[in-house]
Amino acid sequence: MFLLDTPIVFELRKARAGGAEAGLTAWASGVARERLFLSAISLVELEAGVAEATRRDKAAGAALRSWIDAQLVPAFEGHVLPLDAAVARRRGQLALAETRDALFAATALEHGLTLVTRNTAAYRGARVKLFDPRGYTADAAEDEGDWRDAARTGPLWLKNLFVRA
């Protein structure tokens, strides 16, 4: 199962217009919804993104707000992981300089998830499982072939969330 870093979520949003990195889109289209999680930190960062976008361009801010409220939050209902005492305790055990990165790593470790991020260097020494989907191809999947056949709703779910025009 996977915890999505906020930049991954933002990049997947670009897939709606065909602008997301191909490897990321290929990977995400093969993952069942039940296997994906967000951190509450991502919601905080997305809200900051709405505020920033609204300051620059009200229409862009409104579009981002609509996507978060109408698609993202409902799709991840029950899959948004909190910053609780266990995550805080785990964060304290990690020797990472950036609090944000340490909280993502702690959340992934506490819940037994693989952190999907492009910034793998930020997590060196955290002993967290990492996955960088850039350059991913379906043929590159090592042991994931069988579950994709069993989870046929995964690709449709992600297409509806991120790809539909």
Each language-model region and where it sits:
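Short aromatic/basic micro-patch
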Residues: 3, 37-40, 82, 117
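Short, well-structured N-terminal submotif of metal-dependent ribonuclease cores
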Residues: 1-38, 53-66, 152-165
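Short, flexible helix/strand-to-coil boundary loops that buttress conserved ligand/catalytic motifs
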Residues: 13-16, 50, 95, 126-127, ...
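Acidic, metal-binding active-site segment of PIN/NYN-like and related structure-specific nucleases
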Residues: 102-142
